[in-house]
C-alpha cells in the first residue's frame, strides 16, 4: 500500500487490533485496494448464496449460524509455531473460524456489529495427553482451541458462532442463513 499498489493479504489479516487499525489507516491513506484472501468467498456456491440473499428471496435476514471445526485437529504435527501465541497468535478462530464468519458476513453485506459476547477455551491444547508423541507441546499452547460467540448485528440480525480445533464430535454445526421468507 505504501508503494502505491493494491494488496491481497492471506488470512489472518492481522493478529492484533493495533495491527488491523494500522493496516486500515495505510489503505485509506494510499487510496489503493486491500482485500483478504478468503478463497471460499469466491466459490461458485458462495456467489450463488450471496445472489439469493441480495435478491430478497429469503426476505429479511434475522439469524446467521456459523459453526464448524475438527475432531482432534489441532495443527501441531510440524512443531509448535501454529499453537504458540507469539508465532501463531490466532488459534481456531483465526485459523478456521475466520472462513465461516467471512462467508456468512459477506453473504449479508457485512452489517455493523452492535454487541458481542464471546468465550474461548483451550481444554485440549493444554492437555499433555492430547499429544502422545510430544506432550511438551501442551506447555507451549497459547491460543484457543474452542470459541463461541453471539453477535447482535445492525438490521436486527443475530450471529451465533462456534468453532473448534479439537472436539469429540465431527462438527460444531452448519452454516445457516434464516430469513422471513426462507432459509
Where do the language-model regions lie?
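Non-transmembrane alpha-helical segments in soluble domains
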Residues: 1, 24, 50, 101-105, ...
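Beta-strand-loop-alpha-helix segment that lines the small-molecule cofactor/substrate pocket
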Residues: 1-41, 56
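Structured helix-beta-strand junction loops
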Residues: 3, 29-30, 88, 155, ...
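Structural detector of well-ordered beta-strand residues that form the stable sheet scaffold
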Residues: 8, 33-35, 65, 117, ...
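Residues that form or flank phosphate/diphosphate-binding pockets in enzymes
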Residues: 18, 44, 170-172
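Predominantly a Rossmann-like dinucleotide-binding segment in NAD(P)-dependent oxidoreductases
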Residues: 40-141
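NAD(P)-dinucleotide binding in Rossmann-like oxidoreductases
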Residues: 127, 138-147, 152-183
